[in-house]
């Protein structure tokens, strides 16, 4: 179904249509992912922190700043997210011995087990895009990178 049919409307031009289409599709995909995460009692930002900790496990422990730089949502309150995950026993948060102002964060075995059990969530997300060929996915990623570079340039000015 086209975006016009989906929203029952028209657009000023193709740029407007592209922006609305991108936003609408992103919200649909995020909702699907949210539903999958909800079954595991974890929010998207919490999942993102755990994913970062797992991915950089060889460099552990990590600082809050290191995690924040890699978050999908750059406005996330990483300290609060880390506190909640610490309360659930999914990570540890300790004072950094070299700099007491810094906190050192590391994923626990319980956190790793949770991520392992969430493999179905990750597979579900992969299937949301499997109607695209490898070439189309590559093109999509190239176009999204190009759009993001434009927004990065505006933030630098």
Regions found by a protein language model. Give the residues of each.
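C-terminal regulatory/oligomerization modules of transcriptional regulators
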Residues: 1-10, 135-157
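N-terminal leader segment of winged-helix/HTH proteins
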Residues: 1-40, 88-90
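Charged, amphipathic alpha-helical coiled-coil/dimerization segments
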Residues: 5, 83-138
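Pre-recognition alpha-helix immediately N-terminal to the DNA-recognition helix
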Residues: 21, 48-52, 113
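Short, locally clustered residues in the helix-turn-helix/winged-helix DNA-binding domain
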Residues: 23, 51-58, 119, 145
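The N-cap/first-turn positions of alpha helices
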Residues: 26, 43-49, 111, 136
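N-terminal helix-turn-helix DNA-binding core of bacterial DNA-binding proteins
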Residues: 31-74
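Short, hydrophobic-biased segments on the C-terminal half of alpha helices
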Residues: 64, 82-83
